[in-house]
């Protein structure tokens, strides 16, 4: 009887731990997706300076504002305006190749651009030291 009670107690503790961890990751993922959508709205509106200013320190240390403006306009201009964007997935992680340890969410959107339908945008917000999600990477495939 004691063994059964102990096993049930351990399973319940384990299940509560998984649920809490999953719920915390879901909250972080949701906040990061919101931040990514807001940032993408700036890029969609060609507010490149503002998007650079709102990006993560890691991003800004790698790309100057002038380089960002040139890079993003050269990538976005040929694909045209966004016609639709649908969230495909978001994955929380604490490590990324080439990035500092921290909290990241790798987000993918299926995006239909006017001149490049069926594209995949990958955007990676990271949490800064003040708890704000800021974009640290952006790619279109």
PLM regions and their residue ranges:
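Short, low-complexity N-terminal intrinsically disordered segments enriched in polar/charged residues
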Residues: 3-4, 12, 20-47
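Exposed beta-sheet edge and beta->alpha loop/turn motif
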Residues: 90-141
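Second-shell loop/turn segments in exported
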Residues: 25-26, 37-40, 55-60, 110-112
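Short solvent-exposed beta->alpha transition segments
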Residues: 33-35, 49-102
């Amino acid at each position: 009887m004691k063994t059964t009670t102990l096993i049930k107690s351990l399973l319940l503790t384990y299940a509560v731990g998984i649920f809490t961890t999953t719920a915390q990751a879901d909250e972080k993922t949701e906040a990061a997706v919101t931040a990514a959508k807001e940032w993408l709205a700036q890029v969609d509106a060609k507010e490149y300076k503002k998007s650079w200013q709102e990006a993560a320190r890691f991003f800004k240390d790698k790309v100057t504002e002038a380089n960002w403006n040139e890079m993003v306009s050269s990538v976005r201009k040929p694909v045209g305006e966004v016609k639709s964007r649908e969230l495909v997935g978001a994955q929380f992680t604490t490590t990324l190749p080439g990035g500092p340890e921290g909290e990241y969410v790798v987000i993918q959107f299926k995006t239909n651009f006017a001149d490049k339908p069926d594209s995949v945008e990958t955007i990676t917000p990271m949490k800064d030291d003040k708890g704000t999600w800021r974009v640290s990477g952006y790619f279109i495939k």
